[in-house]
Regions:
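Glycine-rich anion-binding loops and their surrounding alpha/beta cores
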Residues: 2-15, 31, 86, 162, ...
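A generic, well-ordered mixed alpha/beta core segment in the N-terminal half of proteins
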Residues: 90-159
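Predominant activation on well-ordered alpha-helical scaffold segments within soluble catalytic domains
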Residues: 18, 22, 37-41, 54-58, ...
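Short, structured segments at the rim of ligand-binding sites
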Residues: 9-12, 19, 67-70, 131-151, ...
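Acidic, glycine/proline-rich low-complexity segments that act as flexible tails and inter-domain linkers
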Residues: 1-102, 116-118, 122, 129, ...
Length: 361
């Protein structure tokens, strides 16, 4: 313990449990930035025993992390685990949940490629069967499309610059988080790691795109980005997504963007507004996007939509999700203008050509 104290400080996880976070969701205290930083440094350093780590993760889950705590975790992850590789292009960083989807098609590959074909570079990142759900994610759709995924960060950056769309593989760019796989798997529930890994931003992008179930989560993510000392994000767009993924939910859905300009606004304010996806051509229900074989069918849908061979609800959903990426980077003044760019990229064949380039990389 003496060596741990010299190396890390005076807040081992067991002490944080007994004195700060471990008394229950109503009476627990929040950690200071210093305490949260030390906790995550110890976790990434494999210092806590499994029982103490599990208890700490559960205590954080029960009390709910503050933006300051999450920002501290993001900063430690950036300093001690993430290997960034910055492309010349400044892509939209898509932070989808790493543990994947289990009911509906993954549309972000198709949407990202369409956006890239329209001139908006896009970066996505994921692992391989990440706990807790261990379901299909970006990697698995790309694998089905015969796109290289198990590549080094420098190659991922080159992919963005050469193709306009790039994929970063978690074991390659974020090995410290990847090393926690077994412990996370044994937990059986999500932890704060599921949140902070989506903010890893391996391409050092200035624009982040994410999703939420409740608007309060989007506000917390913005405050986390603002309070992070390592984040390069200058603009963020969030929307209500399907299964926690960055595929917009059909119907009436909330979109939130940051920053907000104006004299009355502070650094952490967000602007939120409702859209009806049917007004953008996506006039379907969530059930219409369900598939049985998530990776395989998502890949087949992606290929057909980009080739102009489908004009159904999936095609409309891919186009609108591409539009949101284009709008996020401010390559269009409105979502509608982004949608027009996306549809043109599909119609003129450039989206299919971009997919060919991605496969050839």
């Amino acid at each position: 313990m003496a060596q741990a104290t010299r190396e890390y400080g005076e807040w081992p996880l067991k002490r944080l449990m007994t004195e700060v976070v471990g008394s229950g969701h109503k009476s627990a205290d929040d950690m200071s930035r210093t305490q949260a930083r030390e906790a995550f440094r110890r976790i990434l350093g494999d210092e806590p025993d499994h029982t103490t780590l599990g208890a700490f993760w559960l205590a954080n889950r029960w009390k709910r992390n503050t933006p300051e705590e999450l920002a501290a975790y993001v900063d430690v992850m950036a300093e001690e685990s993430v290997e960034t590789a910055t492309p010349e292009a400044d892509p939209v960083d898509c932070g989808a949940n790493y543990d994947g989807k289990g009911r509906s098609a993954i549309l972000g590959v198709g949407a990202g490629v369409v956006a890239a074909a329209a001139g908006t570079p896009v970066v996505v990142h994921s692992g391989d069967r990440v706990p807790t759900q261990k379901q299909d994610a970006y990697k698995h759709v790309l694998d089905e499309l015969d796109v290289r995924t198990e590549i080094e960060p420098s190659e991922s950056a080159d992919m963005i610059d050469e193709v306009g769309f790039g994929f970063y593989y978690q074991p390659a760019f974020n090995p410290g988080i990847d090393a926690l796989f077994e412990r996370r798997d044994n937990m059986g529930v999500r932890t704060f790691v599921n949140t902070v890994e989506t903010l890893a931003n391996p391409a050092n992008a200035s624009v982040h795109l994410g999703s939420f179930y409740h608007l309060a989560f989007a506000k917390k993510m913005v405050r986390t980005l603002v309070q992070s000392e390592t984040s390069n994000v200058e603009r963020a767009l969030f929307f209500q997504g399907m299964e926690g993924y960055d595929d917009v939910r059909p119907g009436e859905t909330v979109v939130a963007e940051w920053p907000v300009t104006g004299e009355e606004s502070d650094d952490e304010d967000i602007a939120d507004f409702e859209i009806r996806t049917g007004e953008y051509g996506m006039d379907i229900e969530s059930e219409d996007l369900q598939v049985d074989d998530i990776a395989g069918e998502s890949a087949a849908i992606t290929e057909a939509v980009l080739a102009g061979e489908r004009e159904d609800g999936f095609a409309d959903a891919v186009a609108l999700n591409a539009a949101l990426r284009i709008y996020a980077r401010e390559d269009a003044d409105s979502i509608q203008e982004g949608l027009e760019q996306a549809r043109e990229a599909i119609a003129d064949g450039s989206a299919a050509e971009t997919l060919d380039d991605l496969r050839a990389f």
